[in-house]
Amino acid sequence: MNAIEIRNLTKRFGEKLAVNELNMTVPVGSIYGFIGENGSGKSTTEKMICGLLIPSSGSIKLFDKDYTDPSIRDGVACLIEAPGCFKSYTVWNNLMLQATNLGIKNKEEEVRRVLKLVRMEGAASNKYKNCSLGMKQRVGIAMALLGKPKLLVLDEPINGLDADGMRIVREILIDLTTNHGCTVIISSHILGELEKIATHYGIIRQGKMIREMTAEELESNCPIYIALKTKDMNKTKLVLSSKYNRVEEDESGYLRVYDLVSTEEVVTFLYDNGIIVNEIMTDKISLEEYYINLMDKKEVR
């Protein structure tokens, strides 16, 4: 069973087509990285999934039920834009107020549970206005987790966070999907962070889904390569191309060898041809580079 199945989803705002016959499949228990440029339709799609916007056409199924089914709506939570917190209230009081609004029984127990999940047990008495940006994001996630949702939709939850803040959010999301039966959709422009946690990806452009893939499929499309520099790069490229199948120059001025060979073999081969290597390393194509290459090549019709 899939957590989300979207077919031919369209949303218009007057003459503007924000989402254009979009298809999306999100497996249960996955962390789905939703990627796209500003204005590509990510937030609009997320708001329709969460019931905050009504589609112009198309269908949304959540756990095999129509997204409007009351029996499934309580299992969907989101953090889109800033959490609705009272600045002068403590973290505890904000969460208690939200638990009351949701009609949750045993509110104190539930608030303690979500505070533990987001690692903020020791910050419950802090006023929200005095929290760091990273802590405020975790308060927002805690509010979304009240009531034990099965599906959590997060829009740019790590923007503006420092490295430690991003690490904590990463660990929280992995814990939610691994140990608490939650499925997570997360959109972010920080693709290096998404690559560390996502199990599935969807890439949207101009309101259309142009690529969906698993982390394993991404890995197979992001090969390892050897990058190197010499004093005479033109000669080096000619020499390397005489032996290896795929040799390319990148934007940083490095030559890349994509054949499955060792750095030692490449250095020896070049030395035997009178070329000394100044720099050499092994690397792989990142999600960010894959995405940029895809955007350059893909034409949406």
Annotated model-derived regions:
Residues 1-10, 297-301:
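ABC-family P-loop ATPase nucleotide-binding domain
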Residues 71, 219, 237-240:
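Short loop/helix-cap segments at secondary-structure boundaries that form the rim of catalytic
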Residues 73, 218-221, 248-249:
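Short, flexible turn/loop "capping" segments at secondary-structure junctions
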Residues 28, 91, 215, 284-287:
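Structural motif detector for alpha-helix initiation sites
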Residues 150, 181, 198, 223, ...:
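Residue-level detector of structured alpha->beta connecting loops
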Residues 224-294, 301:
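Short, charged/small-residue-rich alpha-helical element at the C-terminal edge
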Residues 4, 11-186, 191-205, 209-211:
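ABC transporter nucleotide-binding domains
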Residues 208-229:
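Conserved beta-strand-loop-alpha-helix hinge in the C-terminal portion
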